[in-house]
């Protein structure tokens, strides 16, 4: 299949990487697994056994007329423990490499189908100036965009850093969430070739 390149001749790309069917279930699984892997999972609360104190019973078992109490650290007491206290846990979800790559191929193919993938010969700025990049993107009619190149250009990265709804990634740093989060994905020809190498 062919991909149109802005201001240049169309390039030939593999159907396997950019022309496959959209597998929504697989993409959903990849996105959930990716986001779950970013969760800290270190939340911890104290149960009645973790709270300091409460060893001596507050009053004797019988004779006071009050309900019996064995500790001041039970969940119904102020300063007591939590009934079902949160414990540190690993939220990571396993996703096979083959499935992850298939999900990325599915996303790229859907971007092509929905005309959200903008291919350019090259994309760079001369200096790390946000104004210059904003002007360049406005000229292309892009405001909410992910810029993907084969290697991150320092000037481009610094220029985009202060722009909302604009992100710069290299091919290796692209993930399912970033690829679907933006209205458009601006990608260089060299990045297209690299995606083909990695996912082909």
From Swiss-Prot:
NCBIfam families in alphabetical order: rplD_bact
Location of region: Disordered: 38-80
GO molecular function: rRNA binding; structural constituent of ribosome
Keywords: Ribonucleoprotein, Ribosomal protein, RNA-binding, rRNA-binding
Quaternary organization: Part of the 50S ribosomal subunit.
Family of this protein: Belongs to the universal ribosomal protein uL4 family.
GO cellular component terms given for this protein: ribonucleoprotein complex; ribosome
Name of this protein: Large ribosomal subunit protein uL4
Domain of life: Bacteria
PANTHER family: 50S RIBOSOMAL PROTEIN L4, LARGE RIBOSOMAL SUBUNIT PROTEIN UL4M
Keyword Ribonucleoprotein in annotation: yes
Record SUPFAM superfamilies: Ribosomal protein L4 (SSF52166)
GO terms classed as biological process: translation
Function as written in the Swiss-Prot or TrEMBL entry: One of the primary rRNA binding proteins, this protein initially binds near the 5'-end of the 23S rRNA. It is important during the early stages of 50S assembly. It makes multiple contacts with different domains of the 23S rRNA in the assembled 50S subunit and ribosome.
